[in-house]
Design a protein with these regions (language model features):
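Accessory carbohydrate-binding/adhesion or oligomerization-edge regions at the termini
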Residues: 1-101, 181-183, 254, 531, ...
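Accessory beta-strand-rich segments of carbohydrate-active enzymes
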Residues: 2-21, 40, 44-45, 59-63, ...
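Intrinsic-disorder/low-complexity, polar/charged segments enriched in Ser/Thr/Lys/Arg/Asp/Glu/Gln
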Residues: 53, 119-125, 134-136, 164, ...
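Beta-sandwich strand segments
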Residues: 67-72, 190-198, 301-306
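Active-site-adjacent substrate/metal-binding segments within catalytic domains
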Residues: 91-127, 133-139, 143-150, 156-159, ...
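Extended acidic/polar, glycine-enriched regions
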Residues: 171-177, 239-316
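Surface beta-strand/loop "capping" patches
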Residues: 214-242
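Substrate-binding/catalytic cleft of secreted carbohydrate-active enzymes
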Residues: 357-358, 366-584
């Protein structure tokens, strides 16, 4: 008997995830060490013999109203279109592009959403040859929510558009052709946490990956690169699934073995300690990376190999100065959205690499991932090219302030605590092994501070990397690990840089402008005095210009090529306020 496609998860505040695998680091396994070593970490998902990228043609059906969604998938199977995944509804003709800045796309009354919101159904068939293996499916990005079905059986649910969602499909599959379906609601309760200044889009906008593995496999890995007395040490904590076997870990530089460790009878978890190493540190100026090769051999005979980059860097705040590798640093950054005029959210790896290359060419050394975690490949590129990253959780509730005049409606409400922490935890667990991560950010313009305090306390139990959140500056707490402001006047920045004239609290921690020099029109023409002040005092950490590029929807035909808010018949919009980038779309 088929499970009904019509679940209530998207509108059930108590459910923000269901049957998800625990959050874990991003990696791509191979069956041999040689294949793993020869792979490119950025493109490995497309070349692995243990991972099938399910991106490409999917069957799709769009419903303007959820009430029109049938319960049975077979009832619509013959009436479905073919769409390319990754993509969004707004760039494939199902809905018009829609831009709004700090408001919700509907009248806000959290956690309620419009009951009869649009919904899309995606279907993909694939073949399974070996049912003795375990199989997991991973969605790197789905906006706004997803209910997953496999062979007409309900599997689980996820929200948090820019967070990775992974499910175990093993018990749902059979030999031969299998079918997965994704019911993608336009809005969910979690939409209240995604009120970012951008075009609002929907759909499966990042890659979908199917992994096959034995019982003894790598489920997660955590890299610890501790620093003391001028030396770096390396240790690993591995999660290994069921079964038992041998684990070998090798650190290499350009193919040369630097160190190796082995555990013979590992089961469940394994800890490997390499001790002190002679290694070169990673920084934006010298992004030195090593290869970490993990080889697993199960007692049942299965083999698996993973190769991931590792960088050694040490971050520390002493007083009000931010140090990296024992040197004060300046973050000369930009805010970066996933934005493409043709593909919208669905950026290709080439799009990401182009953006990273451009930032480096213009002497930018930092990116704030405004306002959500990027595709993990973007972080691999930042590791490789050398960019400091402020990795930001997929949290913004700006509309609570602008429309409801209750800025703390979510952040002060303990009922939302689990929703907040889920998004922060999933970002942290996926991205914590990247040397480019220079700060964690708890989100943007979501007021503060009760739920942010909880997230901060939980993060500090797990990491020594500093934690950022701008809005706490307007509370009695004042700051977490750095003082962060957006768009302050020159005179205030100058007083902080000079070490006198500002209130004493401005000097208690490193001072960072998470947004400044709003690049609309001539808005970025006042960079020089800001940058001069960044170099006036060691307490000045720097800042990130708002923002990297204009947002627009491109049309090859028609009277104009680029359109903005209000150009698509929408009543509620924010016009061309999205043309605020350093570069054209």
């Amino acid at each position: 008997m088929s499970d009904s496609l019509r679940t209530t998860n998207y509108n059930d505040f108590s459910v923000y995830k269901d049957n998800l695998l625990p959050p874990a680091a991003y990696f791509v396994p191979f069956s041999t060490a040689q294949d793993a070593l020869e792979s490119d970490p950025v493109t490995a998902r497309y070349s692995s013999d243990r991972v099938t990228c399910l991106s490409g043609d999917w069957r799709f059906r769009y419903y303007a109203k959820e009430s029109n969604l049938p319960a049975d998938l077979d009832a619509i199977a013959a009436e479905m279109d073919t769409v390319s995944v990754p993509s969004t509804w707004q760039h494939t003709g199902y809905e018009e592009p829609y831009y709004v800045n700090a408001r919700y796309p509907f009248a806000p009354k959290p956690p309620q959403i419009p009951a009869d919101c649009p919904v899309g159904v995606y279907v993909k068939k694939f073949e399974i040859e070996n049912t003795a293996l375990h199989h997991t499916i991973t969605f790197l990005g789905v906006a706004g929510s997803l209910d997953l079905f496999c062979n007409d059986r309900y599997v689980g649910y996820s929200e948090g558009s820019h967070n990775t969602a992974a499910f175990d499909l093993t018990s749902y599959l059979h030999a031969g052709v299998n079918r997965v379906a994704v019911v993608n609601h336009k809005w969910c309760n979690g939409t209240y946490m995604e009120c970012q200044d951008m075009f609002r889009e929907n759909g499966i906008f990042r890659d979908v990956l199917l992994r096959s593995h034995g019982a003894f496999c790598l489920e997660d890995y955590v890299v610890h690169t501790d620093y003391a007395d001028g030396k770096y040490t390396l240790s690993l904590d591995l999660s290994l699934g069921s079964g038992s076997g041998q684990v070998k870990a090798t650190l290499l530089q350009e193919g040369r073995e630097v160190a190796a460790q082995r555990v013979e009878n590992a089961a469940g978890t394994a800890h490997l300690n390499f001790g002190a190493l002679e290694v070169e540190p990673w920084s934006a100026e010298t992004p030195v990376l090593y290869d970490l090769l993990l080889e697993l051999t199960g007692t049942e005979g299965t083999r698996e190999a993973v190769c991931r980059p590792v960088g050694f860097r040490h971050i520390e705040i002493r007083g009000n100065v931010f140090y990296l590798n024992d040197q004060p640093i300046k973050l000369l950054g930009v805010n970066h959205h996933d934005s493409h005029p043709v593909r919208g959210y669905a950026m290709t790896l080439w799009d990401m690499e182009r953006d990273v290359q451009v930032t480096k060419q213009f002497n930018v050394n930092c990116v704030r991932t405004s306002h959500y975690p990027p595709d993990p490949a973007f972080l691999d590129l930042c590791d490789r090219y050398g960019l400091y990253v402020v990795d930001e959780a997929d949290i913004e509730t700006h509309g609570c302030q602008v429309e409801m005049h209750r800025p703390g409606a979510l952040s002060h409400n303990p009922k939302w605590r689990g929703h907040f922490w889920d998004r922060v935890e999933r970002m942290f667990c996926r991205d914590r092994n990247h040397p480019c991560i220079t700060m964690w950010s708890l989100g943007n313009e979501s007021h503060g501070y009760k739920n942010q305090d909880y997230c901060y306390q939980e993060l500090k139990k797990r990491t020594t990397v500093p934690v950022h959140y701008e809005a706490v500056v307007r509370t009695r707490r004042w700051c977490y690990d750095v003082i962060s402001e957006m768009y302050p006047w020159h005179n205030r920045v100058h007083m902080v840089a000079e070490g006198k004239g500002a209130l004493p609290k401005y000097y208690k921690a490193p001072y960072f402008l998470c947004e400044y020099a709003h690049a609309m029109g001539m808005g970025a023409g006042d960079l020089e005095p800001y940058v001069q002040d960044f170099y006036r005092g060691d307490n000045m950490l720097g800042g990130c210009i708002w923002e990297f590029c204009d947002h627009a929807a491109y049309h090859a035909d028609g009277p104009v090529h680029y359109t903005y808010g209000g150009d698509h018949g929408e009543n509620k919009h924010d016009s061309n306020f999205c043309t605020d980038g350093l570069f054209f779309p």
